[in-house]
Amino acid sequence: MHSRVPSIESIGWLDASLGGTVPWAYVLGNVINPGFLPYSAMCVYILALDFIAPLVTALCMGRFLLRHRYVQDKYMAVLASLLVFAPSMWANAVLFGNQSGIVCCCVILSMCVLEDSETLAGLLLAVAMCKPQVAFVFLFPLLCKKHWKAITVTSGTVLGSWLLAAILTESSPISMLTDIMDQGLSYNTSYYGLFNFLLGFGISTKVVLLLDVAVGGVILLAAAAWMFRKKLDNDWLLWYAVTAVVSVMWFYKQSHDYIILALPAIAIFCLPHISLPAWGSILILLVDVIAFAVPKVCTLLCGLPKDVVSPWAKLLETVAIMATLYYVFQSAKHHAGRLIC
């Protein structure tokens, strides 16, 4: 992606194969990666932010859990909120200076402050839109619950930043977006969502992503319908936990984007109606282990090329993800039924 504005001489043109960013992040991204600072200062800034952001998020999460009585005492609130630090992918994000951890913290914070300030929640979600593959789906619960102010603030901030980026780089706003989409479709180190395994069978990336979006949308709609029917639609932790699970399957991802799964981890810890049966948990764990081990075992012991085996391993991972969703909703359905009775 090139504009008519010359590159910075000390940096030069960047290799497109190293990745890119959405156009509005040229402006909004400076909150996380301040490009106007000297490189050495920026490294210190983002490293500090990688520690401060989850700490602030954990504190706000603890307050949120106590306020809504998800936990009964401060001790349990501390234990639950510390799960923000739990995802091992934090190490990946910090090591490579990736902003995913901070983006995920912004999403979680938007939930924590929503009832106090829709404007602040909208701004936090707008910053998180620097990685729309993580944050975009979180507009869905806001839409379902008619939080128009938060949606307007998020949309307006993103669109305004996009337009400003186009003006500053003297580029077409549309071409800026299509360029990064084309680049993303050829970025082979990414995990392309729920149907990623189809890539190994020769299916094009565009078809895979369309299937991801379609199935992710169906899951969100089904979850929303179920929550409204069971009168669980005021449970914001449940809304965000379900949406977080969908966020890792509906579009392309990299390992550090999975930090958002801290949300369902907290929900499982706190909500009595989201607990997996023991045998179901063991089954899911076994499928995950098998999916991880199959490529290595077949490559080392059987001499099969990893490219041949990986699609089947990804298929097993997909089964594990869907099994997780199934058991979560079955457990929630059972608990909701007991409450109604």
Give the positions of each predicted feature.
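Membrane-embedded alpha-helical segments of transport systems
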Residues: F51-A53, C130-Q133, G160-L164, L283, ...
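Interfacial segments of multi-pass membrane proteins
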Residues: L142, A267-F269
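Transmembrane helices and adjacent periplasmic/lumenal helix-loop junctions
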Residues: L125-P141, F251-D257
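Primarily membrane-embedded glycan-assembly and transfer machineries that use lipid-linked glycans
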Residues: M1-L120, L142-A262, I340-C341
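Aromatic-enriched
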Residues: L271-C341
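Hydrophobic alpha-helix feature that most strongly marks membrane-spanning transmembrane helices
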Residues: F251-Q254, F269, H273
